[in-house]
Amino acid sequence: MVVLLLVATLVALVYYYPEKFICVDSGPVTGDVIVVLGGGLRERPVRAAELFKQHAAPRIIITGFGDDEINRQILLQNGVPASAIEVENKSQSTRDNAEFTIKLLRAEHARRVILVTSWYHSRRALKTFEHYAPDLTFYSRPSYYAFDWKDWPKHGNEHRMRMEFLKLPGYWLWYGVNPF
């Protein structure tokens, strides 16, 4: 009974304060490369282009199967030169994003990496990359919808949050990626 109460309390805290647990934002940083995780959401490459224009990093790697060309076009439309864009288009999961992109990062001797994904995906993405490449330094600069944190359920994010609530412990159990 006590365990159930503790779990219910934790779920309630995460639900009402997702920005404290789910979202990880490292704040303004510079790195060797920006990595944009795929996911079919336009705000990710737009955010990466903003960071590129702010000189956060000189290169961008797009990672993810299926939306790589769309993301490349969005980057180009937002002022990122083609010479600064590299594409990894084999990955189909966050774990794959890390596995395939880390090979590229090591081949290019990148040490400081800025990850761009959606706010609700930022913790799992950051922890997954850190798990598979503890020798590299990763920062999270997620994209945000323009809304008040207290109103996040009203913006179509409940399904995404439920999926993250399942995927965070799932990644811990299956791949050993500690979400804390």
What is each model feature region?
Residues 13-14, 18, 171-175:
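Structural signal for membrane-spanning alpha-helices in multi-pass inner-membrane proteins
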Residues 1-15:
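Hydrophobic membrane-insertion alpha-helices, especially the h-region
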